Curated annotation (Swiss-Prot):
Record's keyword terms, sorted: Cell membrane, Disulfide bond, Glycoprotein, Hydrolase, Lipoprotein, Membrane, Metal-binding, Metalloprotease, Myristate, Phosphoprotein, Protease, Signal-anchor, Transmembrane, Transmembrane helix, Zinc
Biological process per Gene Ontology, one example term: cellular response to UV-A
Protein's organism: Mus musculus
GN (gene name): Mme
Protein name per the record: Neprilysin
Cross-referenced SUPFAM superfamilies: Metalloproteases ('zincins'), catalytic domain
Cofactor(s) demanded: Zn(2+)
Keyword Glycoprotein: yes
Amino acid sequence: MGRSESQMDITDINAPKPKKKQRWTPLEISLSVLVLLLTIIAVTMIALYATYDDGICKSSDCIKSAARLIQNMDASVEPCTDFFKYACGGWLKRNVIPETSSRYSNFDILRDELEVILKDVLQEPKTEDIVAVQKAKTLYRSCINESAIDSRGGQPLLKLLPDIYGWPVASDNWDQTYGTSWTAEKSIAQLNSKYGKKVLINFFVGTDDKNSTQHIIHFDQPRLGLPSRDYYECTGIYKEACTAYVDFMISVARLIRQEQSLPIDENQLSLEMNKVMELEKEIANATTKPEDRNDPMLLYNKMTLAKLQNNFSLEVNGKSFSWSNFTNEIMSTVNINIQNEEEVVVYAPEYLTKLKPILTKYSPRDLQNLMSWRFIMDLVSSLSRNYKESRNAFRKALYGTTSETATWRRCANYVNGNMENAVGRLYVEAAFAGESKHVVEDLIAQIREVFIQTLDDLTWMDAETKKKAEEKALAIKERIGYPDDIISNENKLNNEYLELNYREDEYFENIIQNLKFSQSKQLKKLREKVDKDEWISGAAVVNAFYSSGRNQIVFPAGILQPPFFSAQQSNSLNYGGIGMVIGHEITHGFDDNGRNFNKDGDLVDWWTQQSANNFKDQSQCMVYQYGNFSWDLAGGQHLNGINTLGENIADNGGIGQAYRAYQNYVKKNGEEKLLPGLDLNHKQLFFLNFAQVWCGTYRPEYAVNSIKTDVHSPGNFRIIGTLQNSAEFADAFHCRKNSYMNPERKCRVW
């Protein structure tokens, strides 16, 4: 046998020979058939399960959404008893307010995350950066350069003081140096024209409410050193803030005197700063309460400058105050001359009337002490550590915070606030998914359509006013994401900041440069037309806006992210998130303020008398409802139903419109797959996602502050108030009648 025919065995050649095979028994045959059948069934089941649709979404985005919702909620709470605790109970257990924060919420977490992105893009050196971006990065570096800031102490401020007529309490010869030539017109104007600081009289150039294509000079009451006029009672919950405020003044005055090697007389410092407090108390009491300033028709008082002089004569230091000289002191800085025939708008006639007897009681020294202080207190945080620390007790009394915000966070926000388009460019390039713009455009179209359709449901509004409301809704312009120019037009962006030149080791001077630049730009607008295409917000902002003068809604790139929006998350969440926000902003065009402006943004009464009266009646229901909420964190104070009315109307309108738009979506596209791990349908998920946007809590000090200053209701009451008025919510969660979340009386405006 040739080699090629040899065989390789796969078994050992010594293996025993097999016996002759026996036939299978009936039992073996039966068992084999059974095994075969079971195998076929198992394979079939596996195949079926692999392709079986159980109606649950198993994508990674659905799993992420479900995990977030489950983590935030407390399913042990009955949703019809307290939907805030049901939706946010888990969030409240897991989250503690950071020592640097006055409040903490899902909104604040998104802002924190945005700040991290800003930090990353602002500190990254790139040789290919355009000039505008280079300037933003230099400004950021100057702000975080703490060694340079600390080494300079208070010297940058000391150099500036002569330009604002000094600070009497911090110098030994003020009466001789400035007192003899001091005039109220020059001193008040200098702070305003150069630095945009409005003390005693709030002079500003803004859009003419009744002719929104033009700018006009306005006179208004000023902001105060404490958060609201209520604080100046200085008793009870406000006592600590008043004490800390005066101590803050004294501490800074002491530091400035020390830096100049001037003697320190504690009694004199205390005497002068308490006099400042006394003066500011009188000014606070002269201001009109916010709830009496919410009708733009009543606020608008147009007259000539000559008429202003006749109607509101003031006397300071025994001399008549010249409104013409004061106005020209400011406007001459931008080479604009104002004649007595110039028309101006007075927003605060009552305040200007009450100001007269106050000014006659105080000396130039007292007035200058207040004015300089109000400017200095804004600048303390840009000086060395010892100046920053002088503010600690004051910050604690107002905000409850025991630590300063991290320097990089404060600096990222500062640069974003002052160079919003340059920073917006960096943010968009780093973090914004451009395709979401088209999805949001479609959502706006849907919700606008729902708003118009629901006008037919309103029995309190007549046909004539409904037609005008529809015209206004159709005319609302939308801005989504960011202005194209910040990416595509480098020259325009560079030119916007052409006059600004920052130095890395001169943060204080950079701040002053920004103040001057911003105020000069605003004053020059007096003889310019209003640019209605201009965005009213930067791109790197977690918020949304409505402008009554432009009839424009804005959704910056910063808010187009979960939980508000994602092209990959369930649409119930998108409609309950950004959908509600869209409805909210559209409704602002028709709230107690926005309803007074027409489709072109002009302050014009387009309502019939009957519809206007009915609107006020419908609104009164919400004033009463929200005004009845008492807030334990604010010492049991009741919310102000008048000051929060516009936001409450917008919340209620927004949730209703977004829900109806989602129902339309389901009719057209069918039901969505459910989310895993949640025994909730998509109607319920819509309301749950809406509520979880507002999960959060406040420090008691800041609750006391915000209940007087914030036009929004606190988050828990935004959830409860809105959903108590929603029959659709009660239906979705099967809430019995007269349960807490389903009261018999429901408020509805839109």
